[in-house]
Amino acid sequence: MLMLENSLANTSQATDTWINHHDSSSAAFSKKKKHDWQGKPYHPISRHYRECFGTKVFKVSVSVAETCPNREGLNGSKICSFCDEWGSAAYHLERDKPLSEQIKINREAIRKRYRAERFLVYFQAYTNTLGKVQKLQDWFDAALMEKDVVGIVLGTRPDCLPSRVLKLFQEYSERSYLSVELGIQTLDDEQLNFLSRGHDSQCSLDAIDKLKEIPGLNVCTHLIFGIPGETDEQLIETARVLSEKKIDGVKLHNLHVLQGTPLEQIFVKGDFAPLSLEEYTRKVALFLEYLDPSVAVHRLAAVASRWNELLAPEWNREKMRPMQFIEDYMRNNQMFQGRLS
């Protein structure tokens, strides 16, 4: 049952660009009747970045955090059922190298492939706010000193936002673009238990509120679709609640099975079946129709970074086909983000 009752009651150039944008764009964007979404039926994150920085911006993923509360056994929690040994890190991360080298290697690869000129350093794997704040500050400073880096993106959990971390976020959001990607996954407590997250939905809602109190901070929530017990009504209500919370972005994933995860054992026993691409597409389209159009969509579906670990579904081996399938489905059915919000 949803726990929503309380929720309802480097560069000065980058800094200047972000501050000027932050004051006006969100309100103005939500009032538009015809959205300039580059031909897509949803608000793509690329559009948000172009509005912020006036050009294309690409994420440079790095891996410096080494663990998370669940792996440390805090509060008696277990490893999340879907998480592999890499802690959600992308396959290409040079995690054994110093931060500056990771940034350089991954930045140059992206620059060469996409002719990119501006970058956000993405602290992706594990829980980046678990540990000493001084270490987090050192990471931020090192990232912002790098050439062509215009901001920071950081992934963390709702239960790892102590006041000292929030204070640090406030300091850096005042002088640079800072986005926090919050892994709430679902707002249903039974489903959170299935995932072995170690926190409840109220913790997620409280975390969103704390982050939204920080001026200039961009807040993106991660969601997983296809958890046992999920209903259409739940997805609609989640879209409505997150819209009312005025989050800035969402990143959507389908629950998929990787080798070496607790979910593998559940899958092998026949107690879990992942969604087909068709059913997942229907769920995503439904969710987006109730999501405020000002919310940027960072990702439409998960993609397995290490194909040799993927057990199911097979379509998670691909990135472009699921995205195109979802876009075509929405266009063919005259659906678009925010139509029913």
Regions found by a protein language model. Give the residues of each.
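N-terminal [4Fe-4S]-dependent radical SAM core
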Residues: 2-120
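Auxiliary Fe-S-binding modules of radical SAM enzymes
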Residues: 2-47, 56-58, 249, 256-341
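Hydrophobic faces of well-ordered beta-strands that scaffold small-molecule active sites
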Residues: 58-62, 119-121, 152-154, 178-182, ...
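Structural recognition of alpha->loop->beta junctions
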Residues: 80, 142-149, 237-251, 321-336, ...
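Core AdoMet radical
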Residues: 86-106, 110-133, 148-161, 177-204, ...
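Acidic (Asp/Glu)-rich catalytic clusters
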Residues: 110-112, 140-147, 169-177, 209-214
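Distinct, well-ordered alpha-helical segments
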Residues: 133-141, 162-171
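Conserved C-terminal portion of the radical SAM core fold
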Residues: 202-262, 278-301
